[in-house]
Amino acid sequence: MIFESTYELRQSLKPAVKVTGDKVEVVDVAKLQDGLIDELARSATFGTEPVKAYARWLIWEIGQALGARPASIHEFYTGRAKGLWENRTVPAMNIRFTAYDTVRAALRAAKRTNAGALIFEIARSEMSYCDLPPAEYSAMVIAAAIKEGYFHPLFIQGDHFQVKAAKYKTDPEGAIKEVKDLIKEAVPAGFWNIDIDTSTLVTLDPPTLDEQQFHNYSRSAEITQYIREVEPKGVTISLGGEIGEVGEKNSTPEELDAYMQGYERALKERGDFAGLSKISVQTG
């Protein structure tokens, strides 16, 4: 069922969810999980614009009430750098087709294996060709967690928030603005993990690695500052950098050093901002 109006939506949820103004209280989790959350998820995807917006808001608030909440993995990653844990991996799954059902399956597996560190991500390009905007994507992840009783932090990630190289050549500020606009849309939706992909701006023509990586690290630092300025209070969004464009030459340790040294220098010049918690390299 897809709700036809926000009134119908509210009435149908009454046995499980109490809505008073902007306050949402879950009064019967079992009834919510027994079909109502499925209808809410479908309405958040296929309803009219008012119904979609209201359904997504309700899913967010229900998730907040039950503990199925978007979170940043920043502290977990920096903990690894400090030697606080080892011998684990963090799968990052690009869920795009039938997102609600696929995330449900992943969370059932996570519960069976007692796995807590897993990421659901979607790239900028995937958002476009799947017609799956940030608010809808996060709603599907949260709704899936509610359905499966997975009341734990949810790591939702913007994968490859990539600067388009072709546009950057003719309109560099416009190309950066496109990524910033996407970030501005994604952060309020719970995308508190973002991979900044400016690796498309690397040019191999200059003689030094610093010059080759210049646009990559300087624009990455610029976008880092922007994210720190728009992230919610109390949240340090986990940020990733990229030094090798997918499908191009493999990365080298020297390129990594050049990128990180330049990035840290450029970020320090902009102020006192938390930097990257991970970096991706091209390995074939």
Regions found by a protein language model. Give the residues of each.
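Alpha/beta catalytic barrel-like cores
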Residues: 1-175, 181-182, 186, 191
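Alpha/beta enzyme core
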Residues: 100, 104-117, 135-136, 143, ...
